[in-house]
């Protein structure tokens, strides 16, 4: 059960909000935890046990860390943190990477590991990172050990962001779990953000996904150079509006319950360097890796060789976090090379270029990265990249190019404008509550019609 299915929109969300505001304040975290567990069980059944086990392990390890720290036994506290991290990484490896590694070994003739046919629990990459942050934050003194397993359970299972983020660090919600403010203005803001995210997903991402699906299925003889670029542009907008739409819905729904989650996107497609792009894209993941991997490894306060190694580890981890496939690792390494090239060679040169040219440079490189990301089959990836770069003697245009432009140019232009701050800037300047309400109701009506028509597609990031 996910945010843009009719059942959640019509029943679950309304029911949970109603119960939440009817019960006393002291019971609200319990309501959220039980509702979130039901939400997850509805879609995953048996895998709910894995999440409960992760919750219990990290809850108890947090208490152990606090006890050992208070007794001056720092060595034992570090062991408790290491045990927590090992457990979370172990379950993540088993469910997400075991079969990938087994198949990779078999492809080179090594039958060391059985292929188990394990399905991936939805959201495991998100909630394991959240629970790991808890024990680390407690050890560092950045957060208090949570005495209430209900409060901690609410943090881990919180259904607005359980399945696809943002990845919430425990210290960001520590005090909100025990004392958060509720107001009509905050609730209304949450509703507005939720509807905006829903519209991003259903009205923009899903429609552009149809163009990308059509383009990636074309044979080498059917593609033209422009068609290949149109397809990957559609995917770039699809993944942005799909994932940022989910984040907006999660932030909005969290706000309805009194929580304030971190922003996960900040208009990445307006960036003028690859470094800036990654400050704006999937912010919760990049900040998690910076705080819990890059800095502990030494960050940039070390020799150049060590710094390059630290960055390599971060980008390998970023790549394989997205999926158990070699193309994701290649995607991470691609950005590693781009970033170190910018930092070591291109930084001052880029600063002297006009803004539009820097933006074009980022756009081209990011679109190439999405071809690597989206196509798991290396042969298909190579053919598609060759088509984009005009290396296969393909025509610049063909009849399909005209067909796709006629049918999808309006939604591509809408997506291009909506991926910049233009819309939100004008929305904030609009001083007409009645008009704002009418726009939101119209958007909600359009989304409802889309869902009722049965044209729902799952969020892309659920598979990560």
Q: Where do the PLM segments sit?
A:
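Membrane-embedded transmembrane alpha-helical bundles that form the catalytic cores
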Residues: 1-463
